[in-house]
């Protein structure tokens, strides 16, 4: 769950 959340945040940023 941590990696996917990081990926979503990175996509937004």
From Swiss-Prot:
GO terms for cellular component: extracellular region. Expressed by the skin glands. It is found in: Secreted. GO terms for biological process: defense response to Gram-positive bacterium; innate immune response. The modification Leucine amide is found at residue 13. Keywords: Amidation, Amphibian defense peptide, Antibiotic, Antimicrobial, Immunity, Innate immunity, Secreted. Its main location: secreted. Belongs to the frog skin active peptide (FSAP) family. Temporin subfamily. Has antibacterial activity against Gram-positive bacteria. This is Temporin-1Tc.
């Amino acid at each position: 769950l941590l990696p996917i959340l990081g990926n979503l945040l990175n996509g937004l940023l």
